[in-house]
Curated annotation (Swiss-Prot):
Protein name: Receptor expression-enhancing protein 6
Biased composition (Low complexity): 188-197
GO cellular component assignments: apical part of cell; clathrin-coated vesicle membrane; endoplasmic reticulum; endoplasmic reticulum membrane; photoreceptor inner segment; rod spherule
Stretches of the chain forming a coiled coil according to its record: none
Region (Disordered): 188-211
UniProt keyword list: Cytoplasmic vesicle, Endoplasmic reticulum, Membrane, Transmembrane, Transmembrane helix
Purpose: Required for correct function and survival of retinal photoreceptors. Required for retinal development. In rod photoreceptors, facilitates stability and/or trafficking of guanylate cyclases and is required to maintain endoplasmic reticulum and mitochondrial homeostasis. May play a role in clathrin-coated intracellular vesicle trafficking of proteins from the endoplasmic reticulum to the retinal rod plasma membrane.
Similarity annotation: Belongs to the DP1 family.
InterPro entries: TB2_DP1_HVA22
Annotated tissue distribution: Detected in retina.
Name of the coding gene: Reep6
A single GO BP: regulation of intracellular transport
Length: 211
């Protein structure tokens, strides 16, 4: 328990958007950052348990700040933070895939969204206890190194088939357009210019009748 509290306090001493906001509140209210953070986490947990729109709030927490931090990482000259947030998005994508198939079952658990939010916060926690980095190096990376050759081969075959299908569809469309143009051309060509010119004899006959 003491180790968890020490990690929590070390996190509050780091420089990021959350700690900057807590520092501003501490300066205005006189309440220490750790109490403000504990209160905010308690309110968040209660809302995720009993509040309306817990799913939306959980997805916002798991997406908005990481997206903001990812843009900052792209614009910064340091590439270490790029690796951190790329790792987070890999874990986030796999978690979303698993959640898609298990959501119908897990949705009915009362602590589902609170647990999901806690997991996402754990994955984006800066420092050596970053959950995304731990999951990547202990679970995802070993599986990837073991199966990446087969995955690359399957992806190459799928991309080749997709290109063949696209080429076949394009060829069929062009052939259909060519057949349609062939059917239209003889009908228009049958109306020769000679047939469209007025007959001089008929014109003269019409003038004599009027006289």
């Amino acid at each position: 328990m003491d180790g968890l509290r020490q990690r929590f306090e070390r996190f509050l001493e780091q420089k990021n958007v959350a700690t900057d906001a807590l520092g501003a509140l501490e300066a205005r209210t006189g309440v220490e950052k750790r109490y403000l953070a504990a209160g905010a986490l308690t309110l968040l947990g209660l809302y995720l348990l009993f509040g309306y729109g817990a799913s939306l709030l959980c997805n916002v927490i798991g997406f908005v700040y990481p997206a903001y931090a990812s843009v900052k990482a792209i614009e910064s000259p340091n590439k270490e933070d790029d690796t951190v947030w790329l790792t987070y998005w890999v874990v986030y994508a796999l978690f979303g895939l698993v959640e898609f198939f298990s959501d119908l079952l897990l949705f009915w658990f009362p602590f589902y969204y609170a647990g999901k939010c806690a997991f996402l916060l754990f994955c984006m926690t800066p420092g050596p206890w970053n959950g995304a980095l731990l999951l990547y190096h202990r679970v995802i990376r070993p599986l990837f190194l073991k199966h990446h050759v087969a995955l690359d081969s399957a992806a190459s075959q799928l991309s080749g088939r997709a290109l063949d299908i696209a080429a076949g569809i394009t060829r069929d469309v062009l052939q259909a357009l060519a057949r349609g143009r062939t059917l239209v051309t003889p009908a228009s060509a049958s109306e020769s210019p000679a047939a469209l010119e007025p007959d001089p004899k008929s014109s003269q006959t019409t003038l004599l009748k009027h006289k």
